[in-house]
């Protein structure tokens, strides 16, 4: 006779002691759950501050565990960068329980509104300028290639908007946006110097072997040979930003994929689909149509080495917002987008107010 004992989720956390981690971090409310992790809001009983706790319970593979540990390492290393421009949640702690069967990561709890929620509640109330300001802020926060890291899963559910005003003329821009969930992030540079047993090397060797990120954001190079010379892995996230910009302009998704087969089929005619959809944004963008069409074409290029960097696209959005750059000449748009930072045909009023343009 077989006796089955049913243990529900609440009992599991109580029985394992996961309600209080490290005698400090108390889990209060489950807020998210994905294929490889579960998230909780809680409280740090040492400081009394609200926290976010991410758990990986019985990782299904060494690759999954490596991704989790790599996210913790990346966030821990952001302390200095966040002191200048805050873009990621502040790291508090991470570790493992039960000989690595459960991994945990503790960060601050970010108070704000997910971009996915903002789109549902505010898209049709917001003007195009207000939506482009959101795009500018997100582009600024999403660019991490200066640290040789790409996020690999940028979508509205991983982007938190802070309820604070943004100064477009400050010497040190703060985009008031926090990018969440770095579990898919990768640095090819770090991988090239890593030992085979290092987490970043395990992640690099596993690229393309399993897909756990959103189908919608996958760029055409998802299944390319990651070791081939000249791979522009640093522009992986630019594709996702192109899709987001299109959504912020039109309110629509450029593509709809339910499975990997649909994604693979779409790649056969992706360039024609993009050209057709982008050409029709004029009813949403009006006087800004030409410049926004050009920007979308430069972000949504199938060949990654020809794709625009996020930080350059951010600068283009800044010029549209601050300089009110709305050219009505196709040739001027083409010349401008070939070199936005060096474009000399316009006398800018405020260009030097964007200090990052000098760096990039």
Regions found by a protein language model. Give the residues of each.
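Activation segment signature within eukaryotic-like protein kinase domains
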Residues: 134-135
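Protein kinase catalytic-loop region centered on the HRD/HxD motif
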Residues: 140-149
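Regulatory extensions appended to serine/threonine kinase catalytic cores
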Residues: 324-360
